[in-house]
Every structure is written in C-alpha cells, then in structure tokens.
C-alpha cells in the first residue's frame, strides 16, 4: 500500500471505494451484502457522505408509480484519485474508469449482474472477499487458494497469468486449481437486446481465439464458459449453434459451455440451496 493520508472518511467508506473499483457499477443492496452489514440505513448514510464529499457518484432516476430501486454508485474523479494514490493498481484499468459517467445503461446492468453472479454462485466466499481484495491491493495479486474457485473481475486481469482473459475479455473470471489441474472459467453476461448476429460473432471469436492463439499447457485441465442469457430465446439459439462449433474444434483440453438465464440465476435468492440449472455443452460429447 502507498502512503496516502486521508482522514475525512472512515475505514468502511474506504472499503466501499475498493468495492466500486473492483466492480465499477454496483447498487446499495449489493454493497450491503458484500460488507455483510445488517443495517441498510447505515450503508446509505456512508454512501450519502461519500457522495457529498465527491468520492463517488450516484446514478438514480426515480420513476413515479413504481417501486423504488436501489441507487447505483460508481467512482468519481476524487474516488479514482484516492485509489491511485493509496494502492498499486493497473493504470490502464483505472484510466478506463474515467469514462464511466458516459457508460450505457446496458453496461451498468452488466456490471451489477457480475456482482450478483458472485453473490449467488459463491455465497460461502462473500464474507471473506473484501479481505481477499484488500490483500491483492496491499500485498500484490496472488491466486493461492487450492480446491476453491477464485473470482476475479477485470480490475485485476493485468495481474493474471492467463493470456485468454486479455484476448476474450470476459465479464468476470474464475480460477480453480486442484490435483487434476487448472480450470479457467470465463463468465459472459449477454445484454438484453443483443442481436443474434452479434452474438454469433462473439461466440465465433472465442473459437477463433482458441484455435489461433497459443494458450495450451500441461497444467490446464479445462476451459469453462458460463453464459448468462437475458431469456430462453438466446439459450435455444446457442444450443443450436454451439454443437457445430464444438464438433469442428480440436484440442486435448476440454472446453465446456454452460448456459442459464438471469431468472434461473436469481431463483437462488429465494432458495440459496437450489441449483442454478446450467445447461452443459462439453466438447467431450462432440
């Protein structure tokens, strides 16, 4: 950690800035879950104070006659400056955050779905994740937990020993190492109105990259792609398209595609013990 004396915000508020740096756009309820804090009023008080002190910006447009949705937050110029002066972070990633005020609604929603993927798919890691991020920022990035999927956002991609993250640019990444080898996991969040032609191009780019780039080594056991779709229409489209691509793909390493809708993912909110119900399409079956 760099030396940066800032005394006008609390330790919890500094943690909130780290969360925003990690996930970019995140709503107040998600922040509350990541902080593992029971009092939402306290969370809102910290956020209000940070906004008034211009460390963060608030994206909130109330619609008359509808239920109030939680406000969305992202780092301001002052917040980014705090991160830059306090931690050793990737300057290129931090530079991209300068344009966050101009980001589309679809991009902001995608960032929040990434948060939900972590909260819903890895509930046993939520309470310790803030400490994990703090360690990465203070002591340097390191994936050192065997037999456990470690969840990584684009904030830390430059530190990863995985060339595919920079080539495929997934919305989030997971790393699993056990006695059988390494599994690289890529999370892709599809926008609500993505054209089918654009989706086809996106999927074909994955296969082109895997065929043309040098990424295989003896340690890698498999590549797994988890695609969160906005509806069943795209699930059906992918189920028709992927088998043909998997049949023509040649590799000693298993490549799997796992499909689910947002609604399937969010069912775990009501019953965390329920399985998401991913549709699995592994290359070993083609």
Task: Show which residues each predicted segment covers.
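Inter-domain helical "communication" segments and dimerization helices
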Residues: 87-99, 141, 151, 156, ...
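Catalytic cores of nucleic-acid endonucleases
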Residues: 169-170, 190-244
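Amphipathic alpha-helical segments that form well-ordered structural scaffolds
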Residues: 30, 116-123, 205, 209
């Amino acid at each position: 950690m760099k030396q940066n004396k800032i005394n006008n915000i609390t330790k919890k508020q500094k943690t909130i800035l780290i969360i925003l740096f990690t996930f970019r756009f995140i709503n107040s309820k998600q922040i509350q879950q990541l902080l593992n804090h029971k009092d939402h009023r306290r969370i809102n008080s910290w956020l209000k104070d940070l906004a008034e002190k211009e460390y963060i910006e608030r994206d909130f447009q109330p619609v008359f006659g509808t239920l109030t949705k939680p406000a969305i937050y992202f780092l301001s110029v002052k917040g980014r400056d705090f991160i830059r002066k306090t931690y050793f972070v990737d300057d290129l990633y931090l530079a991209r955050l300068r344009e966050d005020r101009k980001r589309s609604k679809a991009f902001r929603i995608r960032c929040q779905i990434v948060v939900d993927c972590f909260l819903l798919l890895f509930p046993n890691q939520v309470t310790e994740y803030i400490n994990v991020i703090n360690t990465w920022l203070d002591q340097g990035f390191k994936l050192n937990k065997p037999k456990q999927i470690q969840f990584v956002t684009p904030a830390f991609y430059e530190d990863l020993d995985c060339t595919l993250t920079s080539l495929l640019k997934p919305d989030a990444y997971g790393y699993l190492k056990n006695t059988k080898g390494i599994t690289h996991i890529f999370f892709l969040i599809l926008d609500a109105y993505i054209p089918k032609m654009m989706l086809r191009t996106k999927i074909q780019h994955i296969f082109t990259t895997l065929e043309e780039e040098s990424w295989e080594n003896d340690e890698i056991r498999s590549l797994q792609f988890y695609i969160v779709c906005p509806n069943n229409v795209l699930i059906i489209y992918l189920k028709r398209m992927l088998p043909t691509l998997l049949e023509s793909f040649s590799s000693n390493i298993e490549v799997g595609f796992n499909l689910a809708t947002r609604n399937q993912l969010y069912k775990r909110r009501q019953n965390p013990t329920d399985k998401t119900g991913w549709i699995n399409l592994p290359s070993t079956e083609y």
